[in-house]
Amino acid sequence: MLMAGLRGDYSNEHGFFVTPRAHLKYNPNEYVHFRLSAGKGYRTNHVLAENNYLLSSSRKVEIAKGLDMEEAWNYGASVSTYVPVFGKTLNINAEYYYTDFLKQVVVDMDSNPHEVAFYNLDGRSYSHVFQVEASYPFFKGFTLTGAYRLTDAQTTYKGQRMEKPLTSKYKGLLTASYQTPLGIWQFDATLQLNGGGRMPSPYELADGQLSWERRYGSFEQLSAQITRYFRRWSVYIGGENLTNF
């Protein structure tokens, strides 16, 4: 099945622009589903609202005049499979997405370690994201889900293409959920693995040491919740960051 669309918008700030989009779905049988998508996207960047966490730092904020509306091509592909295993269904889903920016507002924390600058992209900026997810009900009421994601995000900072800072190269997720036969109690646990990534470029202190490490390492976070259901309401108790990161 093919579905295509064309949308037109007018902005008093950016004028008229057209957004094309296309989706393709193919099911060779009841167990396998393929999907493809492609299209263009536009977005107005509100630099202070979207990056307000930087205002609490000691960095000076520099915002260039005439920031463009962001413009990018997006491409995606996914395959979903439903595999019968011991009388139950194992769900496996794999996805890949590629975003290629034609225009982008760059958040530059590398050119000057004491400053954060916002300016229009001059060069390439893109991201590749691949994710695979699997879910299986081992027995009645108990489901285990696992997911893993790889990310490659690159942006050009004043002529130099670099890995986007503060972006984990990979992430993993494992969730377990169990509901008692009468549906009165439910137990949930989630373990998340956050991979390492690049820090903004550091500066050298008076003693020759770097202000911070160039990269940060991976870390895990665990959360859990217990829920008690009643006829018209429910109550729960839970904890986050139980690994104390």
Task: Provide a role label for each language-model segment.
Residues 1-12, 17-21, 136-152:
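Surface-exposed extracellular loop regions of Gram-negative outer-membrane beta-barrel proteins
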Residues 16, 26, 40, 69, ...:
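Residue-level signature of outer-membrane beta-barrel architecture
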Residues 1-2, 31-34, 85-92, 141-144, ...:
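Repeated loop/turn-to-beta-strand initiation elements of outer-membrane beta-barrel proteins
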Residues 42, 193-204, 226-245:
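C-terminal beta-signal and adjacent terminal beta-strands/loops
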